């Protein structure tokens, strides 16, 4: 299954300064897509039959009383299709991780997980 087009979608559910490099994350992911010869898409919803995907990057984290950032992040390539009028989500690649990051944030961790996902894309 070849990906021809993709759009980066960021979902920021982090509080307390646990994820602050959204622009850097988007640019890094878009560069990785270009390096894999995947075109930047322009669609409302990616259609599987057209080999369109969202590169969905989500961080859910909060700062603890001790000052750590605790939460999870999910990086995945997803698309959608309809069969007999029902919508289905197709996940091509996915990385779901949780972390407790002492006295810092999810910034570098997010970039590392995006890199891991791209290492799996052939």
Regions picked out by a protein language model, each given a short descriptive name:
Residues 1, 82-122:
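C-terminal/domain-edge helix-coil "capping" segments
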Residues 1-27, 31:
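A structural "domain/chain start" motif
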Residues 2-8, 28, 35-36, 40-70:
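A short, hydrophobic beta-strand-centered structural micro-motif
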Residues 12-14, 61-65, 77-81:
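Beta-strand elements of well-folded, non-transmembrane domains
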Residues 21, 56-58, 89:
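Intrinsic disorder/low-complexity segments enriched in polar/charged and small flexible residues
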Residues 26-31, 76-78, 94:
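Short, low-complexity, polar/charged sequence segments that are solvent-exposed and flexible
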Residues 31, 35, 116-119:
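A generic structural signal for well-ordered alpha-helical segments enriched in polar/charged residues
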Residues 67-87:
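An acidic-aromatic pocket/loop used at catalytic or ligand-binding sites
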């Amino acid at each position: 299954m070849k990906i021809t087009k993709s759009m980066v979608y960021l979902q920021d559910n982090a509080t307390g300064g646990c994820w602050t490099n959204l622009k850097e994350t988007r640019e890094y992911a878009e560069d990785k897509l270009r390096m894999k010869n995947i075109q930047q898409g322009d669609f409302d919803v990616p259609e599987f039959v057209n080999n369109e995907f969202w590169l969905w990057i989500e961080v859910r984290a909060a700062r603890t009383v001790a000052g750590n950032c605790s939460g999870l992040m999910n990086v995945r390539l997803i698309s959608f299709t309809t069969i007999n009028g029902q919508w289905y989500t197709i996940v091509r690649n996915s990385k779901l991780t949780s972390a407790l990051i002492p006295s810092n944030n999810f910034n570098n961790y997010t970039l590392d997980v995006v890199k891991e996902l791209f290492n799996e894309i052939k």
